[in-house]
Amino acid sequence: MAEKLHISVLCGGQSTEHEISIQSAKNIVNTLDAAKYLISLIFIDHVGRWYLIDQPEMFLAHSPDHLVKEGSARPITIAFGDAAKPWQSLNGDGRRYSADCVFPMVHGTQGEDGALQGLLELLNLPYVGANVQSSAVCMEKDLTKTVLRAGGIPVVDWHTLSPRDATEGVYQRLLDRWGTSELFVKAVSLGSSVATLPVKTETEFTKAVKEVFRYDDRLMVEPRIRGREIECAVLGNGAPKASLPGEIIPHHDYYSYDAKYLDPNGATTTTSVDLSESVTKQIQQIAIDAFKMVHCSGMARVDFFVTPNNKVLVNEINTIPGFTNISMYPKMWEASGLPCPNLLDQLIELAIDRHQEQQKLIRCYEVKARSL
């Protein structure tokens, strides 16, 4: 019988998507095959303290904060020097805990922007999902679009602002540029529609800019696209595959954080999408091309708008897509014939394969001294 792999699922974190991260992690833990894996949770609280929860059933039954308070979650630190045992107890005994592969499910800041991936690289650990560079590029939405546009991939147009930029007259200039007064003001590096605000007037624009700068030091302005919100899941390393597309049908004015997570009737999500075969294939091909262009690996969800005349536009790339019970990434693969348990198996295999390939690369170049 093969030895079980020890999988550490990371969740929580110091971002506005902390709670969503926990829900994603719970769904992953509940789905991973306990016959194949030894599962532990690494919980990062709101102030950045790390805890280990080695009883998955406790994590599924209680909130991580509750487990911290009652002592079931052990405080840990990062231990360098032994990749097989990266977590070290802070309880005084110095015990170290194993991990064969890490499944990061920390959404947003410090989890999806390359910071956590950099730490895992330093620990020499296999981990699921995009590497440092790809994570950083995809977290910065304006940088993502710059790269994709340079590669010929159609994207929603945008304008970037920093707090140092003058905003007087910007709204009118953008109205003239795009021919619409309906715009979106959004944080450059946040997800789950946090700090994403629709505006229709210059007064609303000014207020929205001020509000979004409370969350991020750069923002994007985009024309509002009156089209269908389509998503496509991508899976793989060197030869990625695309799922059948899914669709988000918001019942609010737009697909806000509240519509996503707080209002049970905030939106309808479906994997039975009424698109022509040609548009479906176009979406899948663009999703794969975008994935490869920013050098993603493992997984990503590519979000699109499809206009009434069937023009396909990329909106963004999400390198740690949600895995909650309503999340589209696993649902799209389920509709494509890949059930979630098998999807998780493949993601772990892809992570380990990539790590093994990286280990073959020459990292030290020995320069022989030239004899004088």
UniProtKB/Swiss-Prot annotation:
Which terms are listed as keywords in the entry? ATP-binding, Cell shape, Cell wall biogenesis/degradation, Cytoplasm, Ligase, Magnesium, Manganese, Metal-binding, Nucleotide-binding, Peptidoglycan synthesis
Domain named ATP-grasp is located at 145-349
Which locations, inside or outside the cell, does it occupy? Cytoplasm
Q: Tell me the residue numbers annotated for binding Mg(2+) 1.
A: D303, E316
Stated family: Belongs to the D-alanine--D-alanine ligase family.
Domain of life, source organism: Bacteria
Pathway listed: Cell wall biogenesis; peptidoglycan biosynthesis
Q: What InterPro entries does the annotation carry?
A: ATP-grasp, ATP_grasp_subdomain_1, D-Ala_lig_Van_CS, D_ala_D_ala, Dala_Dala_lig_C, Dala_Dala_lig_N, PreATP-grasp_dom_sf
Q: How is the cofactor bound?
A: Binds 2 magnesium or manganese ions per subunit.
What organism does the record attribute this protein to?
Coxiella burnetii (strain CbuK_Q154)
Q: Which cofactor does it need?
A: Mg(2+); Mn(2+)
Catalysis performed (reactions): 2 D-alanine + ATP = D-alanyl-D-alanine + ADP + phosphate + H(+)
Quote the PANTHER family the UniProt record gives: D-ALANINE--D-ALANINE LIGASE (PTHR23132), D-ALANINE--D-ALANINE LIGASE A (PTHR23132:SF25)
The protein's role, per its UniProt record: Cell wall formation.
Protein name in UniProt = D-alanine--D-alanine ligase
UniProt enzyme class: ligase
Q: Where does ATP bind?
A: 176-231
Name of the gene encoding the protein in the UniProt record: ddl
Where Mg(2+) 2 is bound, by residue? E316, N318
Enzyme Commission designation: 6.3.2.4
GO MF terms here are: ATP binding; D-alanine-D-alanine ligase activity; metal ion binding
* Biological process, per Gene Ontology: cell wall organization; peptidoglycan biosynthetic process; regulation of cell shape
